[in-house]
């Protein structure tokens, strides 16, 4: 079946990409009012998997504090957008520290940082019951992905950035690994928020 449709010059279009096991993604397209009869537009739809934690890039905190820096707003607004585009998910929002400092202190600090992010999200329209804040301190060091090895050639896929691993590296490489361990992530807990009642009966269709 031919699903092609002409796009009106100057028109604005909203596209939604969905796939089971992945987060939804929306993209907007404004057609050039002076576009020729045939013009190609390319839209990319990065769909993060819900089976693994998703890194929230660009979230920063004041040194040794839980306060979010001003330049974190853009990243947090993107996360708000993701949650609004996926209204049926609940998430665990986690914060992680590097190994420096006492483990108990790092766990408390990371918990307060996770709570700071959750506070921002609720203040921007996300339901509190969809969000769980969790601080892991230094207990979950980052595992190196294949993509990370392209940016950091001294690392290998599936390396785990533990204290023991990091201390064997050069000082500048240690700094990189510690920064990778200091991160904010989220993972999907449920995909049925607002869809079922307390008895498990379907009350709404997925959005």
How does the language model describe each region?
Residues 1-90, 129, 151, 174-179, ...:
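Periplasmic peptidoglycan-binding/tethering modules of Gram-negative envelope proteins
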Residues 96-207:
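Periplasmic OmpA-like peptidoglycan-binding domain that tethers envelope proteins to the cell wall
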Residues 93:
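Conserved phosphate/oxyanion-binding catalytic-loop motifs
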């Amino acid at each position: 079946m031919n699903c092609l449709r002409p796009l009106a010059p100057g028109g604005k279009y909203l596209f939604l990409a969905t796939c089971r096991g992945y987060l939804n993604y929306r993209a907007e397209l404004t057609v050039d009012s002076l576009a020729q009869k045939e013009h190609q537009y390319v839209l990319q739809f990065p769909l993060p998997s819900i089976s693994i934690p998703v890194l929230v890039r660009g979230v920063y905190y004041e040194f040794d504090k839980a306060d979010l820096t001003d330049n974190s707003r853009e990243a947090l607004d993107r996360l708000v957008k993701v949650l609004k585009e996926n209204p049926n998910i609940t998430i665990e929002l986690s914060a992680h520290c590097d190994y420096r400092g006492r483990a108990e202190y790092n766990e408390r600090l990371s918990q307060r940082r996770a709570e700071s992010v959750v506070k921002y999200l609720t203040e921007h329209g996300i339901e509190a019951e969809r969000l769980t804040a969790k601080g892991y301190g230094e207990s979950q060091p980052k595992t190196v992905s294949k993509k990370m090895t392209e940016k950091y050639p001294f690392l290998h896929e599936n390396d785990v950035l533990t204290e023991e691993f990091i201390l064997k590296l050069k000082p500048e490489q240690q700094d990189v690994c510690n920064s990778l361990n200091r991160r904010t992530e989220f993972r999907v807990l449920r995909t049925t928020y607002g869809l079922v009642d307390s008895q498990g009966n379907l009350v709404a269709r997925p959005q």
